[in-house]
From Swiss-Prot:
It comes from the Bacteria. Binds 1 Mg(2+) ion per subunit. Mg(2+) binds at D104, N228. Catalyzes the last two sequential reactions in the de novo biosynthetic pathway for UDP-N-acetylglucosamine (UDP-GlcNAc). The C-terminal domain catalyzes the transfer of acetyl group from acetyl coenzyme A to glucosamine-1-phosphate (GlcN-1-P) to produce N-acetylglucosamine-1-phosphate (GlcNAc-1-P), which is converted into UDP-GlcNAc by the transfer of uridine 5-monophosphate (from uridine 5-triphosphate), a reaction catalyzed by the N-terminal domain. The gene is glmU. Homotrimer. This is Bifunctional protein GlmU. PROSITE patterns: HEXAPEP_TRANSFERASES. Residues 1-230 are annotated as: Pyrophosphorylase. Residues 252-451 are annotated as: N-acetyltransferase.
Amino acid sequence: MNNPIAAIVLAAGKGTRMKSDLHKVLHPIAGRPMLLHLMASVDELSPAKKVVVVGDKADQLEAALSGTAELAVQEPQLGTGHAVRQAEAALSGFDGDVLILYGDVPFVPAATMRAMLDRLGASDAPAVVVLAFEPADPLQYGRVITDGDRVVKMVEHKDATDAERAVRLCNSGLMAARARDLFALLARVTDDNAAKEFYLVDIVNIANADGRLCAVVKTDPADVGGINSRAELAAAEAQWQAFRREEAMAAGASLRAPETVWFSWDTQLGRDVTIEPNVVFGPGVKIADGATIRAFSHIEGATIGAGCEVGPFARLRPGTVLGEKAKIGNFVEVKKAVLGAGAKANHLTYLGDATVGAGANIGAGTITCNYDGYFKHQTQIGERAFIGSNSALVAPVKIGADAIVAAGSTVTLDVGDGELRIVRGEQLVKPGWADRFHDAMRKKKAAEQKK
C-alpha cells in the first residue's frame, strides 16, 4: 500500500535579487504565482499534508495560499536544514513520505515527484532520495558523486576537487525521505561551517556515515530551474510559453506565429482554433472549436463560442460571452456582455454590461453608455436588432427584437420590437451659405495681410 505523502515547500527566502515588494515566489508566470504552479503539481499526488515554510512577507503567502496549506515560520533564517525543521511540528504524528521542494523552483512535474517517491519505496529502502540533473553549465552547482544510483558524496563546487568538478551531475536541492528518517537526520545536522547555517544536504552525508543508502533520481534541467532574478523570471516565462504553444498545436490549434502568442496558465482551446500573430490571453479564457482570433487581440475572462471571429485589434474583458459564430471586429471592446449566436460588432464599438440577441448587428461607433459616475447599468439589445453607426445607447435601456436604431441616434428610452428609432437634431439646409461664408473669410484674411 502506498504511504501517505507530505510536501514541505521552502519559501522563506528574502528574494533580494528580485528588488520587489512582492514575495519572490508570488511573481507570476503565465498569470499565476510561481508558487501556485508548484502547488498544482503537488496536488496531483493527493498529499495528506502540505506545509509551506515562510519568513519574509509571510502575510502575502498566507493570502495567496488561502488556507490550502499549513504555514510554518522560519525566523531567524539559518539555512535549508533549519527551514525544513520548522515543518516538524506541523507533521507531528505523520508517518509517511516527505517531499522537500522549493517555492522558486515551480516547474517540477508531478511525474518527477512520483519517481522520487517510488524510489524511496523500493525494496532497498533508501534513507534519502536526491533529485539531480545535468545542466549545460554546471559551474555554480554542487555536485552529486554517485556509484550507480547510490549517492556517495555531495560536495559544493567551491569545495570540489578537479576530478569532482568534472562530474556533471548536480544537486537540485529537492529530496524525499520518510518523515521518521528525515527529522531524525536533521536533528544531527550542525552549523559547523563558515556561514553558521544548517544545510539540508548534510543529511545525505550523515546517512552515508550510518551505512544507510542514499539514492539519486535524475531529471531534465528544465524541470528544476530556480528563479532568483527578473531575468530568470523572464526565462521561466519563455520556457512555459514555449511548452504551452507546442501543446496547443499538438492538440489541434493553428498558431500562425507561435512565438508571438502568449497564453495564460488556464487558457482552453478547442480543435481547429486559429490564432494569428501577437495575441495575448489573460486568465479565464475558453475558446470553442473553429474560432479565429486575429492579430493584436487581447482577451481575458472570456468565453468564445464555436466558429467565432475576434479581431484584429479587439479587446475582450472579463464577463464576455460570445455565442456561436458571433463576430467582434477591429477596435471593439467588450466587457460583461453576452452576444448571441451570429451577433456582430465589426468595428469601433464599446459593449459593456450588455446583452445582445442572436443575429443583431452593432454598427461602427456604437457605445453602450453604461456608467453614470456611480453605478453601472444594463443595455439589452434584442434578436436581429440593427444599431446604426455612431449611436449612443444610454443605459438602462432596452432595444427590442428586429428594431432599428438610426445612425447618429442617442437613445435614452426603450425601443419596442420592430420599431424604428431616430433621435437626431433637426437637419437644416441653407442654400448658398457656405459660398457666402468662404467669400467673407477670404476678404477678411486679405485685409489682415495688407496691414
